[in-house]
Amino acid sequence: MNSFIYNIPTKVYFGENQLGNLGKELLKFGKRVLLTYGGGSIKRIGLYDRVLTELHNAGVEVFELSGIEPNPRIESVREGVKICKEQNIDVLLAVGGGSTIDATKFMAAGACVEHDPWEFFGANAKPIERALPIVTILTLAATGSEMDTAGVISNLETGDKLGRLAQPLLPKVSFLDPTLTYSVNKYQTACGSADIMSHILEVYFNTQEDLYMLDTFMEGMLKTIVKFAPVALAEPENYEARANLMWTSSWAINGFINGGKRKAWSCHPMEHELSAIYDITHGLGLAILTPRWMEYCLDETTVDKYVQYGVNVFGIDAKMDKMEIAKESIRLTAEFLFDTLGLQRTLSEVGIKRENFHTMAQKACRYGDIKGFKTLTVKDVECIFEMCE
């Protein structure tokens, strides 16, 4: 196992009836709060009123920024930065899913610099050395942004969707109440589950063979998704299902499973190009890509990892031929994503045309070949897009 540093000091309030602690946590950082959220869902489920009550009881001054988009835009980040600077905001409170939290992270960072927040991204990205404190209330189990140092922002003007990692982006406190996800519809529950699964598979499929502890941890999380995602779809107010998905979402991407693993992610840079141009749901794009990426990477040098995955996650008979186990593991992954979760199978089903495949492949490899489970060139990425067609 390679050396690594693990430092995720986010304080988590998990479970029902935890919002009573919101006021005291915010007051640790100041009294001027920027409340950020997306559309009207937090108002429809009564969460908005609950949050405002807690904030007013704490005696803080509240400023609001609503309308943060799925695949959040740099324009929303800029507006948040403007409010932070003009109103001398002390702490940001993001209420929503990963899009709201991601946008809020870069508002918090942008408030501490003079340059445009888009300069945090790209090949010549400026450093993120500090950010205003961030507190989150999670309403969707998917991205894990509530407990990680990352965020992804879209720029429609340039046609880019880019991610960034930086320790100051880590939320100080996150409230994870599974009941707040009861109202999430089947489609978003399915997309969120696919997103969580991809976060794990991106790390799990690795050529290092000395990470038994981390591999078994990841296999447990994968089995959790396979078990509880269908339950959440059938019984949206099943607390155990929602709780297991929510906690798995956080641990899938908070840095723990990365310990000692050095390979780059493969499906995420490819998917970012799909949603940058076509604005599809991130988890859906990952679902379409993942089985084809797995199929493309399968050969005699990688087959053992598929065997481990198929036997330990899906219970495939270990006595079968190795290549047959590998192929069956891919088939079962696709069956879970497309049949069990009910997500679309192909890019053409969601309106993505071959005409942009080459351009998207080039942009996915903007920093060079993707050095993941198997190194992917522009041509490789284009081939995977074609397999998804």
Regions found by a protein language model. Give the residues of each.
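C-terminal charged capping/lid subdomain of soluble metabolic enzymes
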Residues: 313-389
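A glycine/threonine-rich phosphate-anchoring loop and its flanking beta-alpha core
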Residues: 10, 20, 113-210, 304, ...
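ATP/NTP phosphate-donor binding region
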Residues: 1-91, 347
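Fold-independent oxyanion-binding glycine-rich loops
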Residues: 16-17, 37-39, 68, 95-97, ...
